[in-house]
Amino acid sequence: MRYFTAGESHGPRLTAIIEGVPAGLSLSAEDINIELKRRQGGYGRGGRMKIESDQVEITSGVRHGKTIGSPITLNVTNRDFKNWEQIMAAQDVEDKIKKQRRLTKPRPGHADLVGGMKYEFEDLRNVLERSSARETTMRVAVGAVAKKLLHELEIEVANHVVNFGGREISSPEHLSVQEIRETAGRSDLSIFDESQAEDLRTYIDQIKKAGDTIGGIIETRVEGVPAGLGSYVQYDRKLDAKIAGAVVSINAFKGVEFGLGFEAGKRPGSQVMDEIIWSENKGYTRSSNQLGGFEGGMTNGEQLIVRGVMKPIPTLYKPLMSIDTESHEPYKASVERSDPTALPAAGVVMENVVATVVAQEICDKFNSDTINELKKALVDYKKRLSEY
């Protein structure tokens, strides 16, 4: 299973093509729209979310509500395109139009300057349009398909914010996907402890008033994953490495950890490793889950616990200093639409990205043409594991 995305932030539409989804999976546009709506929610979101109300159009790979094994094409129209039609036109236009919304003042922390240098662009909008977080719309759309597939296999995924701009959010160590959905899933801040919500909203409002932004840490948990996904035999087959790469590929994500994560480096081994236990009913399990469900790059049958750190949004309403690429004179950086934080939305993106990697691994391992064949292969595999 693989996918590609295409489209610019202010272009006519965003597109994703997914290949390798087994035939027979029930799938509707509404399944995807639910996830797209989640991405556009959350406290602290602003202008673009009021303009866009994303709706997907499925144009291939699904017939009469079922996948048919061929590539699935997903399209999301940019409703704001009518205001950008000439500026973002594919055909050549007059110079006076080209100069409209031209960007020569790169924003610190964005791809603007380095992208312009790399591709020899005079107008840095060519970089901004693709490097924008708007691209994550299609990462979520793809993830919605992956989550539907995982649900059929009794694998579930959820996320919550565990740190908001340096403020820790309290949550229990043992936390099920269902508990996350019933708490953080109903919070506009995506937090487990709603008693902290009002203070956080005040904090976000203060950050917005100051023209600044905040980041934080998001935790995604996955349940129902069997042991043995991924492999230790080559570096690029380790599933935790694949997940880490996928998470840091999300706009503004700068780090990943599993289980104890970086805390493990501060403790002796006896306080880090998860002891192995066995019972006739459950087979091999662990006494704890401090390694976040991974050993040797492989799932060990425990809940997957993945955290990603998101830097503050780099577009500031009180912009930092930059250099104009035409004059080389110092200027305050350009200001596009921005929010004080996008953590709740970023959590939805991370959740769907992690789900996609897990679904890809399952499809690659069991290589089934139909969803029924995939289900049977997974049942047989779990039976083999239970007999070890």
From Swiss-Prot:
This is Chorismate synthase. FMN binds at residues 130-132, 251-252, 296, 311-315, 337. It comes from Lactococcus lactis subsp. cremoris (strain MG1363). Homotetramer. It is an enzyme of class 4 (lyase). Keywords: Amino-acid biosynthesis, Aromatic amino acid biosynthesis, FAD, Flavoprotein, FMN, Lyase, NADP. Pfam families: Chorismate_synt. One of its GO terms (biological process) is aromatic amino acid family biosynthetic process. GO terms for cellular component: cytosol. It catalyses: 5-O-(1-carboxyvinyl)-3-phosphoshikimate = chorismate + phosphate. Gene3D superfamilies: Chorismate synthase AroC (3.60.150.10). HAMAP family: Chorismate_synth. Belongs to the chorismate synthase family.
